[in-house]
């Protein structure tokens, strides 16, 4: 198993206060400016297609699929975090780990193993200029290049033009 290294001596992560306004996540930047989350901004572009999908499959099925996807994402993120914390593989993938998550992790593991020199985990990011904020899963080196990394668990490949 790979041992991940963490970079020491970095500044403390900035803490951004977040709250909901009309069901939309908003952050308060260090300057005091209130900005929407990047997820909220991007969500405006998806609303029509999500509404069409919900109408096509029905509310009950849409809620079931959405709930399953959210749960899978949370469990997968927890697995990856344990792995990046250098926990033994048997603590990352346990007997209770669902088969789909086992498979997802096994597929992703070679890519995850290309990560090193971890700077931050679950890190807030923001732009005063763009007026947005959010969180990334990881700031670390991927193949030796400092990168912003966000773990994705979609079961469908996204089109390049999305």
Residue ranges and their predicted role:
Residues 119-162:
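Mg2+/Mn2+-dependent nuclease catalytic core
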Residues 1-133:
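Metal-dependent nuclease catalytic cores that hydrolyze phosphodiester bonds in DNA/RNA
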């Amino acid at each position: 198993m790979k041992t991940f290294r963490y970079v020491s001596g970095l500044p403390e992560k900035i803490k951004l206060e977040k709250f909901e306004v009309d069901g939309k996540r908003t952050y308060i930047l260090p300057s005091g400016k209130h900005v929407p989350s990047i997820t909220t901004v991007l969500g405006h572009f998806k609303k029509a297609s999500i509404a069409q999908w919900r109408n096509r499959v029905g509310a009950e099925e849409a809620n079931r699929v959405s709930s399953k996807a959210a749960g899978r994402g949370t469990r997968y993120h927890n697995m990856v975090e344990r792995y990046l914390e250098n926990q033994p593989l048997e603590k990352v993938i346990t007997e209770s780990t669902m088969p789909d998550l086992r498979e997802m992790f096994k597929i992703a593991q070679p890519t995850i193993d290309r990560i090193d020199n971890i700077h931050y985990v679950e890190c807030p990011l923001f732009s005063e200029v763009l007026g947005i904020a959010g969180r990334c899963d990881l700031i670390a080196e991927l193949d030796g290049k400092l990168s912003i990394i966000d773990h994705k668990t979609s079961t469908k490949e996204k089109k390049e033009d999305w």
